[in-house]
C-alpha cells in the first residue's frame, strides 16, 4: 500500500504530485552536525549518531494514519474517506502510535535498537525521545488514548516500515546511561534544542533541490544509499559555526 508524505498540485496542469512517506522519513536523517549537544545527553560516536538517525526515521510516523492519508487519496487508500476519525495532527498521532507499541513488548523488541537495557526499560527511557521527535512542529504532543485514526492495516504497514528502517542503522544503540536520573534531566533540559535539530533535519530533507520526490516504490536501502550521497551536498549549504572573537 502506498502512503504519501507530501503533495503538491500543479496550478497550470492541475495534476497532483506526491512524495511517498517512507522516503521522506529517511531523508530527514541527514544531519549529524550536532555532536556537542548529543554528547551531553549520552549519545557519542557512531552508535550515538545512528541512534539519532534511527529516531529521526520515525518523526512523521503519524502520517500512516488513515485520517492523514485521506487528505489526498492515492491508489490503495480509497476506503479512507469512509472511515470516521478523530481530528488530531500527525505529531499527536505519531506519539500515540509509539505509546501503544510500548505496551506490546514482543512487537517492541523487533523495532528497537540493541541495548543492555531490557525491553520494558528501553520503552521507559525512550518516551521523552519519541515525544521530542514526533513533536517537531513547535509543541510537545499530548497523549491521546483510544484513537481510531489508524486502521489495523495502517498499524501493520507502519510497523513493517519501522522493522525495515531499523536494519539501516546496525550500529544504533540505546545507551545504558539513559536510565540515569542526571541524564534524563539533561535530556529534558536540551529537549527544545534537540527538537529544533529535528526541525532543521526536516527542512533540509524536504529540499527538492537535493532530495527529489519519489512516487514509485523502491527498496528502502536503495533510496537510503542515494539519500546519503545527496546529504553531503545538502549539508554543505549550512553556514559554518561562528568563531568566538578574542578580547
Placement of each model-derived feature along the sequence:
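Conserved mid-sequence domains
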Residues: 246-247
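Accessory nucleic-acid engagement/destabilization modules that flank
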Residues: 2-15, 19-243
Amino acid at each position: 500500500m502506498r502512503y504519501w508524505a507530501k503533495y503538491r498540485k500543479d496550478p497550470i496542469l492541475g495534476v497532483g504530485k506526491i512524495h511517498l512517506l517512507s522516503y521522506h522519513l529517511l531523508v530527514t536523517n541527514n544531519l549529524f552536525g550536532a555532536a556537542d549537544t548529543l554528547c551531553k545527553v549520552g549519545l557519542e560516536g557512531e552508535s550515538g549518531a545512528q541512534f539519532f538517525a534511527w529516531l529521526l526515521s520515525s518523526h512523521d510516523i503519524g502520517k500512516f494514519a488513515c485520517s492523514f492519508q485521506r487528505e489526498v487519496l492515492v491508489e490503495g487508500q480509497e476506503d479512507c474517506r469512509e472511515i470516521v476519525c478523530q481530528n488530531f495532527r500527525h505529531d499527536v498521532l505519531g506519539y500515540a502510535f509509539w505509546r501503544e507499541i510500548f505496551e506490546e513488548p514482543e512487537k517492541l523488541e523487533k523495532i528497537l535498537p540493541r541495548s543492555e537495557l531490557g525491553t520494558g526499560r528501553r520503552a521507559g527511557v525512550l518516551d521523552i525521545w519519541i515525544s521530542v521527535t514526533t513533536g517537531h512542529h513547535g509543541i510537545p504532543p499530548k497523549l491521546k488514548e483510544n484513537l481510531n485514526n489508524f486502521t489495523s492495516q495502517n498499524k501493520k504497514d507502519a510497523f513493517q516500515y519501522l522493522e525495515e528502517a531499523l536494519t539501516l542503522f546496525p550500529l544504533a544503540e540505546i545507551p545504558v546511561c539513559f536510565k540515569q536520573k542526571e541524564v534524563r534531566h539533561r535530556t529534558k533540559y536540551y529537549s527544545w534544542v534537540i527538537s529544533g535539530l529535528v526541525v532543521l533535519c526536516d527542512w533540509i530533507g524536504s529540499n527538492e533541490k537535493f532530495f527529489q520526490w519519489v512516487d514509485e516504490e523502491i527498496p528502502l536501502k536503495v533510496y537510503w544509499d542515494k539519500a546519503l550521497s545527496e546529504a553531503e551536498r545538502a549539508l554543505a549549504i549550512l553556514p559554518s559555526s561562528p568563531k568566538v572573537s578574542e578580547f
